[in-house]
């Protein structure tokens, strides 16, 4: 049976995907150098460790195998598409806000989520926190001010006031 040229294959690591691996080799006493083959499906994108099995076949019914770890470990949080979110200002209430977005190195576009309760009606500034979650344990956050500032004085409806006589 072929003997692997390297006793232990090095782990292959990446944040998002591994699209291919250089095939290892083995040596056979009759056939010389043999390149390993695998039935692994590429790209490998699943977070965590995937075990790839390499098979060395000398063509004479004497195969041998060797395994290699492929480790996908996304450690990069999404980056907000806009560095600072614009303030949202209203006189009475803000019923909703268009969710901002971020870009993730593995997942692409991520839409922010918030646990803020809408409508926001409290006078003054309310800080809304947006969370961008890439699904791989790397959240990032961004804040946005919602400012409720009632600057319009009430106007009396004089058409409905009755005359008062004494």
What is each of the regions a protein language model found here?
Residues 1-166:
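Proline-threonine-serine-rich low-complexity tracts
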